[in-house]
């Protein structure tokens, strides 16, 4: 039997996934079923774009429910390792890009809760991979799709 994939995440990230799952199961699923009922009332299903659209949305919602359920069931909560001097999963790292000194901060999380717009990057991302295990004042070369970037870590929290 194949081993299930483990999804490292923070407690906060797991809670957000649980909230989304609950919403999909209790609200969105019912809305989609109602849309399907209404679309069926329009008659001929072979040329009924409302019905097709509602069925596509239903497939998406059910797929997302399955995905979220799997991620939550196989979640591994990131424990605080106690050492705030080393970049690790769950830590927020602030660095300056060299030589211009532009400061950036990211929290390194598991891929299930990554959201770059909220400053949360996946531990599988090029930036995170380069920073993991490093310490304050370390200078790091980061390989990105746009080329190399040189940074210096200024804070870990």
From Swiss-Prot:
<dbReference type="InterPro" id="IPR028624">
    <property type="entry name" value="Tscrpt_elong_fac_GreA/B"/>
</dbReference>
<keyword id="KW-0238">DNA-binding</keyword>
<comment type="function">
    <text>Necessary for efficient RNA polymerase transcription elongation past template-encoded arresting sites. The arresting sites in DNA have the property of trapping a certain fraction of elongating RNA polymerases that pass through, resulting in locked ternary complexes. Cleavage of the nascent transcript by cleavage factors such as GreA or GreB allows the resumption of elongation from the new 3'terminus. GreA releases sequences of 2 to 3 nucleotides.</text>
</comment>
<dbReference type="InterPro" id="IPR023459">
    <property type="entry name" value="Tscrpt_elong_fac_GreA/B_fam"/>
</dbReference>
<dbReference type="Pfam" id="PF01272">
    <property type="entry name" value="GreA_GreB"/>
</dbReference>
<dbReference type="InterPro" id="IPR022691">
    <property type="entry name" value="Tscrpt_elong_fac_GreA/B_N"/>
</dbReference>
<comment type="similarity">
    <text>Belongs to the GreA/GreB family.</text>
</comment>
<dbReference type="GO" id="GO:0003677">
    <property type="term" value="F:DNA binding"/>
</dbReference>
<dbReference type="InterPro" id="IPR036953">
    <property type="entry name" value="GreA/GreB_C_sf"/>
</dbReference>
<dbReference type="GO" id="GO:0032784">
    <property type="term" value="P:regulation of DNA-templated transcription elongation"/>
</dbReference>
<dbReference type="GO" id="GO:0006354">
    <property type="term" value="P:DNA-templated transcription elongation"/>
</dbReference>
<dbReference type="InterPro" id="IPR006359">
    <property type="entry name" value="Tscrpt_elong_fac_GreA"/>
</dbReference>
<dbReference type="InterPro" id="IPR036805">
    <property type="entry name" value="Tscrpt_elong_fac_GreA/B_N_sf"/>
</dbReference>
<dbReference type="GO" id="GO:0070063">
    <property type="term" value="F:RNA polymerase binding"/>
</dbReference>
<dbReference type="Pfam" id="PF03449">
    <property type="entry name" value="GreA_GreB_N"/>
</dbReference>
<dbReference type="InterPro" id="IPR001437">
    <property type="entry name" value="Tscrpt_elong_fac_GreA/B_C"/>
</dbReference>
<keyword id="KW-0805">Transcription regulation</keyword>
<dbReference type="InterPro" id="IPR018151">
    <property type="entry name" value="TF_GreA/GreB_CS"/>
</dbReference>
<protein>
    <recommendedName>
        <fullName>Transcription elongation factor GreA</fullName>
    </recommendedName>
</protein>
<keyword id="KW-0804">Transcription</keyword>
């Amino acid at each position: 039997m194949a081993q299930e994939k483990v999804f490292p995440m923070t407690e906060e990230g797991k809670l957000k996934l649980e909230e989304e799952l609950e919403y999909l199961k209790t609200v969105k699923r019912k809305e989609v079923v109602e849309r399907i009922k209404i679309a069926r009332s329009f008659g001929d299903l072979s040329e009924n774009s409302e019905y097709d659209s509602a069925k596509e949305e239903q497939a998406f919602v059910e797929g997302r429910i399955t995905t979220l359920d799997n991620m939550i069931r196989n979640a591994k909560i990131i424990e605080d390792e106690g050492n705030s001097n080393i970049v690790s999963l769950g830590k927020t790292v602030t660095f300056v890009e060299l030589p211009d000194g532009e400061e950036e901060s990211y929290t390194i999380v598991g891929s299930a809760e990554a959201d770059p717009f909220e400053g949360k990057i996946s531990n599988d991302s090029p930036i995170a991979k380069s920073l993991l295990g490093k310490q304050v004042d370390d200078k790091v070369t980061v390989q990105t799709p746009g080329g190399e970037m040189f940074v210096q870590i200024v804070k870990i929290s």
